[in-house]
Curated annotation (Swiss-Prot):
CDD domains: cyclophilin. This is Probable peptidyl-prolyl cis-trans isomerase. Keywords: Isomerase, Periplasm, Rotamase, Signal. It catalyses: [protein]-peptidylproline (omega=180) = [protein]-peptidylproline (omega=0). Residues 1-26 form the signal peptide. It is an enzyme of class 5 (isomerase). It is found in: Periplasm. Belongs to the cyclophilin-type PPIase family. PPIases accelerate the folding of proteins. It catalyzes the cis-trans isomerization of proline imidic peptide bonds in oligopeptides. GO terms for molecular function: peptidyl-prolyl cis-trans isomerase activity. One of its GO terms (cellular component) is periplasmic space.
Amino acid sequence: MSFIRSALAAAAFVALSIGAVQTASAADPENTVILKLKDGDVALELRPDLAPKHVAQIKKLVREGAYNGVAFHRVIPGFMAQTGDVKFGNMDKGFDAARVGTGGSNYPDLPAEFSKEPFVRGTVGMARSQNPNSANSQFFIMFDDGPFLNGQYTVVGKVVSGMDAVDKIKKGSEAENGAVKNPDKIIKATIEADTK
């Protein structure tokens, strides 16, 4: 009987140790983006191991303040919330409701970095046109699993805290492909390492 208790205790210790290692590896401040939204902060763990070029571009844009004030212009209930059009989507300066969702940044589009990482609730993926090598600054956060996106879009990270704030982002009209009138926005985006 004591052997079983010892084995269970050892198994519990190993499970807790693995959990601690996973938590520690998910807490890399250099690859954590904090999005300040109206309903709270959202922490995104970026994955340079999956998409190094995309992650580098997102971090560059965050550090430039390019995402501050940018609308969640396309939000489809049960699917995803899309943002990141730094050219036409800035609600604080130059918002263009007719063109939002068609712009990117002043940097070149990126080659696809598809992976086997699945699109599940909280996954952060890069938006693009039909051309797989057209992602630039726009990204989306999954409300639910989307296996039909697997291997078709670049995964750049996942939400590690604040999914409740993501769930409260103003939804768009399904009849208009998720277009949002008077959309919510990213109030401010920062790299966690820069705030310490």
